[in-house]
Amino acid sequence: MSHPGRVVFPEPGLTKLDLVEYYLAVADGALRGAGGRPMVLKRFVKGIGAEPFFQKRVPENHPDFIDTATLQYARGTSAEEAVVRDAAGLAWVVNLGCLDLNPHPVRAEDLDHPDELRVDLDPMPGVDWSQIVDVAMVARDVLEDHGLVGWPKTSGSRGIHLLVRIEPRWDFRAVRLAAESLAREVERRAPGLASARWWKEERGESVFVDFNQNAKDRTVASAYSVRPLPDARVSTPLDWDEVRSRRPAEFTVATVLERFGERGDPHAGIDDAVGSLDGLLRLAEELGPAEKAPRGASRGDGSGRRVSTMPLIEVARTETKPEALDALDRWKAANPEVVPHLTPADVLVDGMRGSSSLWYRVRVNLQHVPEAGRPEQGPLLADYDPWAGRWPGGSGDGGGSGGSVDGDGVD
């Protein structure tokens, strides 16, 4: 290891060596979630207070005990990614500055057919834990009704992840369709509590059943991943009978070490619960085509971009989240008469996928502000361009956009 005594989490005083020892202790569970899968390396080389960068390609000088798999991407590029198969591989990943593990939903032996369907229950601002749990229970029932078993874990942030082992018979498009059908059925059974709407400003104070984590090239923080929060929180597998009574903040490196030592991994049986997508794909046929864009949406501005049906204004585009929150505070200070009308869900701070790191977009939905009092779209308080110089012609407007990251997904 390099710099084993470097403090990674100042609040609990955890060093780089502490993180390696943690992953060695929970290796059985961590490898059950991430082992044998190509993974994106999310490297916090400047600490948890700085933005990480995402490295798809495995370092050339990787040790012999790190396998690799070459993935093909939508733009015609490819990347040889790391495949961890043992505890030594986990230690190597941490030594690179990775905190959480971000594997693809495929095995290295078959890169075209996922063996795991993933659902991220992502709460909008203003949603409490009990509502997230209510939606999780509905999702569990929908899965069971269609012959599948959902395995819950905390996301390590505010939400819940449901993992579903499936037969590797379907391609990414079919798996995503099955997940989308699950999300739509959850929304139908829990109206007002859950949303399958893709456009964030239309979800209100609901739990977004994020099916798009099943798109190709997406990854999700896997079980026992340490998340970049000050308390060293862990994405922790749960039994269904403890989902309602536990809270994400209870699960940190220290408490999960004790929990794992006492009871082992609640997901120990996940690989024995492999199911078929036939039921969810039949549900997709019954539900019919999903709504491609909200009613009234238009692309008639000549840009090819979707025009929201909501009265949105954009506040800023920034390189880091602290800069985004600072811009939001400045906008609120300049518009004090608007702030009392805003609900938590009206303030949209989105992490956006750049080429190798996240950038942030700040928008405000003025739907609850009286029309006469709505401010006009003005100049952005910050206008960071993550694509500048990376595409022919300069800015990213000519080269494509990365899209937003909901919950804990990584592109």
Regions found by a protein language model. Name each.
Residues M1-L14, V20, D28-L31, G35-G36, ...:
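C-terminal accessory nucleic-acid interaction domains of nucleic acid-metabolism proteins
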Residues M1-L90, V94, R299:
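Charge-rich, low-complexity segments
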Residues L41-F44, G150-G156, R197-E201:
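Short beta-strand
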Residues A82-S155, I166-A174:
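Signature for HUH/AEP ssDNA processing cores
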Residues G147-K153, A194, T343-L348:
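A short linear hydrophobic-aromatic micro-motif
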Residues H161-E167, V207-F211, L358-V364:
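A short beta-strand motif that forms the metal-chelation/ATP-contact edge
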Residues A297-D411:
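Acidic/polar low-complexity segments and flexible, solvent-exposed patches
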